[in-house]
Each structure stands twice: as C-alpha cells, then as structure tokens.
C-alpha cells in the first residue's frame, strides 16, 4: 500500500466532514443494530459488535450514542431488517470500485448505486467483476501526535501486524484479515486510539485517471456514494496522488 495510502489527508478530510457527522452516526447505529441482532448485545461475546463499536469510536461517535444504539437494537425500537450487500463496478477510465451497503430496501439501494455509477461516467457490474483485484485486509490508523514511531511500530508488529508505515502524521498498520481483531485488541489494551479501525478492500494495483474531467467525475462518484445513507464503505483502486 506504500505510496498510495494518502492517509495523511484524513485530518483535513475529517474537518470537512464535521457537517456530515450526524449521517455517519446514523450509519454506525445501523451497523450496531445488525451486529446486536446477529450476536447479542455484549461485545465481549460478540466480535462483530466489538469491531463496529471500535469503528464508531474512531468516527468520534459518543459513548452515549453507542449505548443507546445497543439498547435500541436489543429491544423493539428498530423493526427494520437490514442486510449486507456488496456492489462492484467501474468508475471513469476503468477504476475498480467496491461499495459495501447495509440496507432495509435492496431495490432502493441498487437503484441509487446504479444511478451514481451512470451519472458519473461509470457502470455497475456483476458480483466478482472487480473484487478479484482486491484483497481483504485489516487497517488501523493511529494519529502520530506525541507518539514514538519506533515504539508504535514494535507494538504493532509484535501484536501480529503485517506491515507498518508512517505517512505524514498518521501511522498506518496493515493486518491479515484473520489477525485484525487480535492486533486491534492488543493495541487497544496498550492504550492506543484509532483514527480508523476496519476491514478494507486493498487493491492489488492502482489506476491513474488522465482526463481532468474524469477526475472530477470520479471524485463526485465517491462523494455521492459515501453520502448515501445505505452505503457503509467505498473502496477503489484510483491512484489520486
């Protein structure tokens, strides 16, 4: 992932996303609902819930909001039946895009996702059309402020991380999918806080966009997908450095 992480931009991006914080919290609450219904309300016995909680905390979701979402999911407060759906397609100039969704209306979500692909120079494909270009990996991001790089690196590698990189104020820690929870929990026990904590699709290779108008379309495709209430995460292999 070296040279393509662009995680140094995450601080600036977070500032511009403050206005969308409510939308992000709504998405996190939806993910918590699904995790609780599938495995119970105790994160110590529900790895999926524990993972979602850490992801929510990385998004600065207050503990009160997290607790309310868990209690609501444990009762009868939210009767919607959500399902995980993954869409695959291409953006402008052959950029591969994977869209992870959590929805209570499959038809609505499919229509919205297809609309954005069509509107911004892409096309929605079949399952498997681009996922072979990615590997499922664990990703942990830590703000480097006031932390010793060598100490964080050794703690990460000792915990089982595959790779560690310092990228302009952000420590980037990559793990195998099966080791993600172990590495995350070990670092949490050591007191580290994450800017991002999630399983991601890591591209095997990257694609550059040469036409400036297509750069604009690709940015709008990503932004519109990420703004959708049903979309949890957007992955792509665009090298936008």
Curated annotation (Swiss-Prot):
Q: Does the keyword Transcription regulation apply?
A: yes
Localization of this protein: Cytoplasm
Q: Which domain of life is it from?
A: Bacteria
Q: Which GO terms describe its biological process?
A: regulation of DNA-templated transcription
Where in the chain are disulfide-linked cysteines found? none
Pfam families, A to Z: TACO1_YebC_N (PF20772), Transcrip_reg (PF01709)
- Gene3D superfamilies cross-referenced by the UniProt entry: 1.10.10.200, 3.30.70.980
Record GO cellular component, one term:
cytosol
Q: What is its main location?
A: cytoplasm
Keyword vocabulary terms for this entry: Cytoplasm, DNA-binding, Transcription, Transcription regulation
Which Gene Ontology terms cover its molecular function? DNA binding
Does Cytoplasm count among this protein's keywords?
yes
Q: Which family, according to the similarity comment? A: Belongs to the TACO1 family.
The protein's name is Probable transcriptional regulatory protein FMG_0893
The protein's organism comes out as Finegoldia magna (strain ATCC 29328 / DSM 20472 / WAL 2508) (Peptostreptococcus magnus)
């Amino acid at each position: 992932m070296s040279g393509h992480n662009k995680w140094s931009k995450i601080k600036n991006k977070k500032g511009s996303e403050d206005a969308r914080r409510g939308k992000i919290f709504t998405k996190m609450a939806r993910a918590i609902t699904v995790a609780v219904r599938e495995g119970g309300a105790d994160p110590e016995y529900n790895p999926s819930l524990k993972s979602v909680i850490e992801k929510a905390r990385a998004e600065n979701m207050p503990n009160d909001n997290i607790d309310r979402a868990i209690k609501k999911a444990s009762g009868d407060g939210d009767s919607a039946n959500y399902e995980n759906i993954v869409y695959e397609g291409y953006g402008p100039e052959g950029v591969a895009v994977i869209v992870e969704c959590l929805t209570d209306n499959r038809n609505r979500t499919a229509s919205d996702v297809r609309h954005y692909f069509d509107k911004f120079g892409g096309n929605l494909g079949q399952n498997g059309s681009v996922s072979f270009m990615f590997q499922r990996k664990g990703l942990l991001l830590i703000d480097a402020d006031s932390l010793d790089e060598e100490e964080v690196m050794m703690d990460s590698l000792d915990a089982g991380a595959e790779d560690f990189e310092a990228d302009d104020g952000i420590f980037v820690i990559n793990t195998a999918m099966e080791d993600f929870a172990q590495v995350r929990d070990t670092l949490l026990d050591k007191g580290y806080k994450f800017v991002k904590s999630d399983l991601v699709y890591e591209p095997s290779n990257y694609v550059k966009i040469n036409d400036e108008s297509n750069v604009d379309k690709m940015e709008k495709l990503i932004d519109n997908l990420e703004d959708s209430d049903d979309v949890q995460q957007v992955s792509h292999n665009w090298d936008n450095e």
